[in-house]
Amino acid sequence: MNVLAYARRHGRESVAWYGGLGLLTLRVARNLQLPPSYLVIVAREIDIIGVRSLVVALTAALFTGMVLALQSAVNMAIFGAENYVGPVVALSILRELGPVLTAILVGGKVASGITAELGSMKVTEQIDALRAIGVNYIKKLIVPRVLAALVVFPLVTIMADGVGLLGGMLIVVFDRGVDPYLYWNTISYWVVMKDFLTGIGKSVVFGGLITLIGCYNGLETTGGTEGLGRSTTDTVVQVAMAVIVSDFFLTKLLLLLFW
């Protein structure tokens, strides 16, 4: 009986959460046009989301490329195909690992920070004060963060892709003895523009989704500091799950459309 009660309660909470997130998305879409004075806020959010997250994203990309190249080279050498490690690394990073790892690592950091900031404003009634004086808090607090994420996540993903490919080259050249020109030539032969654009398109969707989750959980925070801690923890988990689940559906859609 307790299990059924928990399932019903959890089901209601899940429906309410998805519905609230959808409504927030619609409200953001209706308020995308910002006054010039708000562009300063967008620039500040770009710095917070992108510049301050580069070290994490690029370090992860470097070692991901190295590990992927190492594992691929060892196994492909069995079949005499070690010269084709480059395309395997490139396709894996450009289509999947680059956008997904960037979204999970940077997104978890960014979204939890957004939840903590907006949640503290909610529990201290600052958002209620903005409403009381007639300020559109969606336009002032949410839209700049979403726009910044839509710009930053693709740019960080592009840099992560490049660093990941360089990491793969380091292993292939210095550990496996493959000519670096062969590494890049095989990549340029097998990898086409749509492989690159697939990952960039995913990163745009991930950026918007991650930011909306962080904002929504912050706005729905209740229960003081304890509730703020729960909201921040929930955001990290929900961001990771949202990226992984949406990646499957995006991959399926892109394969149907372009392959």
Q: Which residues does each PLM region occupy?
A:
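Loop-to-helix entry region at the N-terminal start of transmembrane alpha-helices
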Residues: 48, 56, 60, 81-114, ...
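Short, membrane-interfacial amphipathic segments enriched in basic
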Residues: 1-40, 217-222
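Start (N-cap) of specific transmembrane helices in multi-pass transporter permeases
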Residues: 137-157, 231, 235
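Membrane-interface helix starts
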Residues: 34-59, 237-240
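Final/C-terminal transmembrane alpha-helix of multipass membrane proteins
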Residues: 228, 234-252
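Hydrophobic alpha-helical transmembrane segments of multi-pass membrane transport/permease proteins
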Residues: 56-71, 249
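Membrane-interfacial helix-loop-helix connectors in multipass membrane proteins
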Residues: 71-94, 162-204, 208, 212-232, ...
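Short cytoplasmic-facing helical segments at TM-TM junctions of multi-pass membrane proteins
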Residues: 118-143, 225-228
